[in-house]
């Protein structure tokens, strides 16, 4: 099914309506959006309907095989550094303003939301580590996220709880050295990955809600 990225509309907003940004000129905006639009129109949009008709496969070795073409499209996005568009260049990101990442995400989600969620969730982890991570954690994780070598997941749903986080039961308790997790998560978005980042809310008793 066809999709055409709204390049001219986006450029107009970025160049005329939003406040100027010292690291962003019209030439950069045009070049970045043009390439992002090509990826959306030529790679992601054609996969959208195909992915709806061809479900991912869970193999006997418990590895997940995504629909044909998804892996290649993700490889193209990762090689281009697109996941880390707004991430600090000190950690192999592009270092562009968040507004550029927002525009690109609009294209990709408009073209193929089921595919684009993977990079969006990874960008969420990039934001989290950038805001609260130690320098050691940033050096360890951010280059991997920015390159697409590691990707993010979303772990909200439990047997008794959907997106109502006040009703979740999974907790983590600190034993003095490590966090011990107890609970169950289901319907994990892009969950078939080895590396998971846990976001918790600490309580006075050192319990945490995952």
Explain the meaning of each model-derived region.
Residues 82, 89-92, 134-135, 157-161, ...:
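Short, glycine-/Ser/Thr-/acidic-enriched flexible segments
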Residues 95-100, 127-133, 163-168, 191-194:
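Short acidic, glycine/serine/threonine-rich loops at helix termini
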Residues 199-210:
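Single conserved hydrophobic/aromatic residue that forms the stacking wall/gate
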Residues 1-116, 140:
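Amphipathic, small/basic residue-rich leader segments at the start of a protein or domain
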């Amino acid at each position: 099914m066809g999709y055409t990225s709204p390049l001219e509309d986006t450029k107009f907003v970025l160049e005329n309506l939003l406040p100027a940004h010292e690291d962003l000129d019209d030439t950069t905006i045009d070049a970045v959006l043009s390439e992002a639009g090509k990826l959306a129109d030529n790679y992601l949009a054609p996969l959208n309907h195909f992915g709806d008709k061809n479900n991912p496969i869970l193999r006997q070795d418990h590895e997940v095989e995504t629909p044909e073409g998804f892996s290649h499209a993700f490889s193209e996005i990762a090689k281009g550094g697109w996941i880390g568009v707004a991430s600090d260049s000190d950690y192999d990101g592009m270092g562009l303003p968040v507004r550029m990442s927002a525009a690109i995400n609009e294209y990709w989600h408009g073209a193929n939301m089921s595919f684009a969620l993977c990079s969006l969730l990874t960008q969420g982890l990039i934001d989290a580590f950038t805001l609260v991570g130690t320098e050691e954690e940033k050096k360890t994780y951010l280059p991997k996220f920015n390159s697409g070598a590691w990707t993010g997941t979303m772990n909200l749903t439990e047997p008794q709880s959907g997106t109502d986080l006040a009703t979740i039961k999974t907790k983590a308790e600190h034993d003095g050295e490590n966090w011990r997790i107890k609970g169950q998560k289901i319907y994990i978005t892009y969950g078939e990955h080895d590396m998971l980042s846990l976001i918790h809310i600490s309580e006075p008793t050192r319990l945490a809600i995952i």
